Amino acid sequence: MGCTLSAEDKAAVERSKMIDRNLREDGEKAAREVKLLLLGAGESGKSTIVKQMKIIHEAGYSEEECKQYKAVVYSNTIQSIIAIIRAMGRLKIDFGDPSRADDARQLFVLAGAAEEGFMTAELAGVIKRLWKDGGVQACFNRSREYQLNDSAAYYLNDLDRIAQNSYIPTQQDVLRTRVKTTGIVETHFTFKDLHFKMFDVGGQRSERKKWIHCFEGVTAIIFCVALSDYDLVLAEDEEMNRMHESMKLFDSICNNKWFTDTSIILFLNKKDLFEEKIKRSPLTICYPEYPGSNTYEEAAAYIQCQFEDLNKRKDTKEIYTHFTCATDTKNVQFVFDAVTDVIIKNNLKDCGLF
């Protein structure tokens, strides 16, 4: 009797082949799926990185979407000048021109009555006059002593453009907007044949307990640090230096048992602001033991070492560090390209596909 397969056996073999094929396809699909968790203290630039992904890997912001940011631009601009004026009282700084005190009073009245998404010519004029004042500028230069948005000067210097009735925010204006992230914001995009899911998590302390369920199965963590925070205190805790808070958080993430096999990518962000600030504000404010000069290269390298030294598994775990400026699309594009190559190398080899 010949050794032929019955119809039933043939069907079983086909089923087995199909299961193997599906498993292989699922494995390849899983290998192409990348979960990225964006972590870091508040205002370290995480949400700006997410916006850049939309600009770089999707079609960017449509005119309609840009229009929706108009109210945020105006709110950020008004809140910035108000924060400076309030700080003048606290820091006992006088107006360069005494008549600006009337403008300051007017600012509070007009800002309180302002309709969302609109800026009257009267309000724009008041803000412009105040921003030009010598006392206001002196207070702005001491912004490390109070809480002020990074984008304050960007918007206030461009008031003529943004106060026009026909104003539509540009992609750069949108990148500069500041809205506190609450909860978890998820973004999807495809790059180099990989399907990315990026999770932006609220950085303020009150938000951190919401991170936990995002952690499982994460491919890589991008940890953002604002280099320019070295001389600032936290919005939630006036005693805690922001850089020390970042280091504390990085330590807990980097050495967490859940992340033993997770690639950790460190973005030392806001390098542009740091380069400006280090000329006038010494690094010893944050690191009293710092022996070097206050040059960008030396100070930035020292901060990099402070973070990388927190890694307790140096023999088995590498930290991939990049200096970034999250508002610079070309810089983020270049860095993210390098990050993706690391992810491909580290993760596809685990699946035997690299």
Curated annotation (Swiss-Prot):
Its main location: nucleus. A lipid is attached at G2 (N-myristoyl glycine). Residues 32-354 form the G-alpha domain. Residues 196-205 are annotated as: G3 motif. Gene3D superfamilies: GI Alpha 1, domain 2-like, P-loop containing nucleotide triphosphate hydrolases. GO terms for cellular component: cell cortex; centrosome; cytoplasm; heterotrimeric G-protein complex; midbody; nucleus; plasma membrane. Its EC number is 3.6.5.-. It catalyses: GTP + H2O = GDP + phosphate + H(+). Residues 35-48 are annotated as: G1 motif. GO terms for molecular function: G protein-coupled receptor binding; G protein-coupled serotonin receptor binding; G-protein beta/gamma-subunit complex binding; GDP binding; GTP binding; GTPase activity; magnesium ion binding. Pfam families: G-alpha (PF00503). GTP binds at residues 43-48, 150-151, 175-178, 200-204, 269-272, 326. Residues 324-329 are annotated as: G5 motif. Residues 265-272 are annotated as: G4 motif. One of its GO terms (biological process) is regulation of mitotic spindle organization. It comes from the Eukaryota. It is found in: Nucleus; Cytoplasm; Cell membrane; Cytoplasm, Cytoskeleton, Microtubule organizing center, Centrosome. Keywords: Cell cycle, Cell division, Cell membrane, Cytoplasm, Cytoskeleton, GTP-binding, Hydrolase, Lipoprotein, Magnesium, Membrane, Metal-binding, Mitosis, Myristate, Nucleotide-binding, Nucleus, Palmitate, Transducer, Transport. Myristoylation at Gly-2 is required for membrane anchoring before palmitoylation. Palmitoylation at Cys-3 varies with membrane lipid composition. Heterotrimeric G proteins are composed of 3 units; alpha, beta and gamma. The alpha chain contains the guanine nucleotide binding site. Part of a spindle orientation complex. Identified in complex with the beta subunit GNB1 and the gamma subunit GNG1. Identified in complex with the beta subunit GNB1 and the gamma subunit GNG2. GTP binding causes dissociation of the heterotrimer, liberating the individual subunits so that they can interact with downstream effector proteins. Guanine nucleotide-binding proteins (G proteins) function as transducers downstream of G protein-coupled receptors (GPCRs) in numerous signaling cascades. The alpha chain contains the guanine nucleotide binding site and alternates between an active, GTP-bound state and an inactive, GDP-bound state. Signaling by an activated GPCR promotes GDP release and GTP binding. The alpha subunit has a low GTPase activity that converts bound GTP to GDP, thereby terminating the signal. Both GDP release and GTP hydrolysis are modulated by numerous regulatory proteins. This is Guanine nucleotide-binding protein G(i) subunit alpha-1. It comes from Xenopus laevis.
